[in-house]
Amino acid sequence: ASYKVKLVTPEGTQEFECPDDVYILDHAEEEGIVLPYSCRAGSCSSCAGKVAAGEVNQSDGSFLDDDQIEEGWVLTCVAYAKSDVTIETHKEEELTA
């Protein structure tokens, strides 16, 4: 399946279709969208965002704790879309504040 991913970035909103078996960060890059990242393994906070609507699966990540995930935090490098989803990107400073 594919879902519509909407990224709300400081430069504006980007939308694309993302297969449910491709990480959101990887597919955004294929679409030419530049997002922050570092480890690409779900073990840091460089790519952190906040889910504003919809659902993701980020069980491959290790950096976020359950409370942060419940609050809507997401690591785009290890997140699969599970529905149409809206994510506010570039949130590392807010997450680690």
Curated annotation (Swiss-Prot):
The answer to whether the entry has keyword Nucleus is: no
The answer, when asked if Chloroplast is one of the entry's keywords, is yes
Q: For [2Fe-2S] cluster, which residues are the binding ones?
A: 39, 44, 47, 77
What biological process terms from GO does the record include?
Answer: electron transport chain
Q: Which cofactor does it need?
A: [2Fe-2S] cluster
Q: List the PROSITE patterns hit by this protein, alphabetically.
A: 2FE2S_FER_1 (PS00197), 2FE2S_FER_2 (PS51085)
- InterPro entries (UniProt xref): 2Fe-2S_ferredoxin-like_sf, 2Fe-2S_ferredoxin-type, 2Fe2S_fd_BS, Beta-grasp_dom_sf, Fd_pln
State a GO cellular component annotated for this protein. Answer: chloroplast stroma
Q: Which GO terms describe its molecular function?
A: 2 iron, 2 sulfur cluster binding; electron transfer activity; metal ion binding
Q: Which domain of life is it from?
A: Eukaryota
2Fe-2S ferredoxin-type domain residues are 3-93
Q: Where in the cell is it found?
A: Plastid, Chloroplast
Q: Which CDD domains match?
A: fer2
Name a Pfam family for this protein: Fer2
Q: Which UniProt keywords apply?
A: 2Fe-2S, Chloroplast, Electron transport, Iron, Iron-sulfur, Metal-binding, Plastid, Transport
Per UniProt, the cofactor note for this protein states: Binds 1 [2Fe-2S] cluster.
Q: What is its main location?
A: plastid
Q: Which NCBIfam families match?
A: fdx_plant
Task of the protein: Ferredoxins are iron-sulfur proteins that transfer electrons in a wide variety of metabolic reactions.
Family as reported in the entry's similarity comment: Belongs to the 2Fe2S plant-type ferredoxin family.
Name the chain's protein: Ferredoxin
